[in-house]
């Protein structure tokens, strides 16, 4: 930041104010000066220190998300959709991969929360007691996905596999089918 300020002959504080301004209505610097600062930052390859910004603003601009598998198109599609929706709102996803392991999920929740995310999205509703404690104490929005939970930590976005299969079996039974089987994969242990 000091190099940008020196090149433009302005104070570091002016550069800081221009870079931290996220709203056009905020006029701590003129728009013309802000554009000069942004151009100079781009020319010099200056990258904003998000750690410092998080410290001063108390906003990280990230949403933590934990998924069980990267090689499952359902979860990779979820991560892609979440990323696209958040990006449109100026937020970024910090993605963790649990490999269907609850102890790994708890470790990742602790690690993600240490980054001070704006929210955390976890897959499923089965968590260790320690993970549930961390999520409840986080002080940020918690979203559990892919299940309809009787006792969610906070928010749930999902569906009930049991209800969906029940509806399917009832429909098939209603059409006269009696020998019904289900074949499905299970995560490797």
Outline where the language-model segments fall.
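Short, basic/glycine-rich phosphate-binding loops at helix/coil junctions
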Residues: 17, 31, 146, 179-181
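N-terminal helix-turn-helix DNA-binding module of bacterial transcription factors
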Residues: 1-58
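Secondary-structure junction motif
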Residues: 182-189
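Proline-glycine-enriched beta-turn/loop adjacent to the NAD(P) cofactor-binding site
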Residues: 13, 68, 185
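Alpha-helical recognition/docking segments in bacterial nutrient-uptake
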Residues: 57-174, 188
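Conserved beta-strand segments that form the floor/walls of ligand-binding pockets within enzyme
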Residues: 158, 181-182
